[in-house]
């Protein structure tokens, strides 16, 4: 990030530690996060809560005074973001059949790079025009702007996010809607979301094609 390296006199691997802290937390907390996501009582509230916390930590990064604070906050960002990717598709898969799911999952995947592309231009403009405003460096303003975008959307999630069919019913769904959703699971032979125990992850790790995807990502 422009200006951050110079402000903290970062050298060598110090820049790599930003990603290392984030990735370490992402790896460690993804499985525990998904275990929580599989609980119907938590499924509706967990993702919005994680996004609110992500936004708060993003704001906090704008106020760091040394690089070690930034490392700690990057670790927290990775922790809060860890179950979001898999959790989103877990939630989608609990409501839609295969024929319906690929459109929604595809839209989600398309929006990710589009969002990154647009945010890149916005961040460049913000850095150029806000650098020095309020006595703060441009890179600090980028964290503030990211937080401003994130927190209102995350708070909206408490109202509109449905969780899984067995979660507490949101206001916009009737009892009949919930019954229909559950009957669709049986009609399309969609396995009803259950708790993700450690035995599930053990079975997953024993399947060869999972490791093929791991090496593809590497």
Annotated model-derived regions:
Residues 75, 202, 206-218:
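Pair of pore-lining "gating" transmembrane helices in MFS-fold secondary transporters
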Residues 66-74, 86, 137-138, 211-213:
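Short hydrophobic/alpha-helical segments at membrane-entry points of transmembrane helices
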Residues 28-71:
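Conserved MFS/SLC helix-loop-helix module at the cytosolic interface between two early adjacent transmembrane helices
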Residues 1-29:
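Extracellular/periplasmic helix-loop-helix junction of adjacent transmembrane segments
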Residues 97-114, 121, 127-201:
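Central mid-sequence intracellular linker of multi-pass
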């Amino acid at each position: 990030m422009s200006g951050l390296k110079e402000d903290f006199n970062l050298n060598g691997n110090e820049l790599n530690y930003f990603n290392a802290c984030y990735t370490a937390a992402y790896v460690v907390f993804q499985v525990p996060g998904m275990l929580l996501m599989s609980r119907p009582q938590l499924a509706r509230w967990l993702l919005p809560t994680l996004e609110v916390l992500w936004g708060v930590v993003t704001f906090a990064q704008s106020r760091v005074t040394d690089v070690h604070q930034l490392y700690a906050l990057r670790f927290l960002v990775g922790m809060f973001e860890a179950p979001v990717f898999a959790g989103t598709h877990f939630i989608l898969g609990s409501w839609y059949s295969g024929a319906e799911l690929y459109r929604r999952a595809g839209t989600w995947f398309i929006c990710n790079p589009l969002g990154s592309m647009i945010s890149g231009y916005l961040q460049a403009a913000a850095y150029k025009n806000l650098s020095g405003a309020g006595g703060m460096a441009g890179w600090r303003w980028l964290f503030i702007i990211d937080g401003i975008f994130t927190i209102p959307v995350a708070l909206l999630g408490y109202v509109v996010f449905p969780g899984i069919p067995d979660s507490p019913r949101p206001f916009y769904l009737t009892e009949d809607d919930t019954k229909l959703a559950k009957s669709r699971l049986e009609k399309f032979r969609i396995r009803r979301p259950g708790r993700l125990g450690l035995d599930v992850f053990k079975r997953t790790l024993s399947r060869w094609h999972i490791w093929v995807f791991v090496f593809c990502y590497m």
